[in-house]
Amino acid sequence: RFRHAAALLGALTAITLSHAADTETSPAKNAASADYIAGQQAVEAKQWKAAVDAFTRATLQDPKNADAWNMLGYSSRWAGDYKAAFAAYERALALDPHHRGAHSYRGVAYVRTNDLAKARAELATLDGLCGRDCEEYKLLAKAIAEHKPQ
């Protein structure tokens, strides 16, 4: 189970770091934010509270940054705060309804909270946005396939 979590974290981190260019939020804007960078570093180090704190500051500095909201959701989920995670994903998707990372991560959060119907709805959304070959779709499809009810 630990190896699976570590592999999933690695895949999520790779998607996260590569996804910024696919959204309406400018990667240059993210690069200029020391808090966003600190959040990314905390994610890479699996320091979830530090990541939540950094991405919270990043969203306060730039409330229209869908990537920062997405990463706040991601970090909150890993910290075990699903309520905060879902709220952050909602904000990211309100800003950018086509944000593949937010759809994928929210879908994984639905899997982790045993709401497979909503997870599958996110998967269908991703299929429409990027097809079945995009990393975000594959990640969520794998999480659904490997789900074991808790």
Model-identified regions with their sequence ranges:
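Alpha-helical segment of the N-proximal tetratricopeptide repeat
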Residues: N30-Q61
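Helix-start (N-cap) detector for alpha-helical repeat units in TPR-like alpha-solenoids
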Residues: A32, A66-D67, R100-G101, D133-C134
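Canonical tetratricopeptide repeat
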Residues: M71, Y105, L139-A143
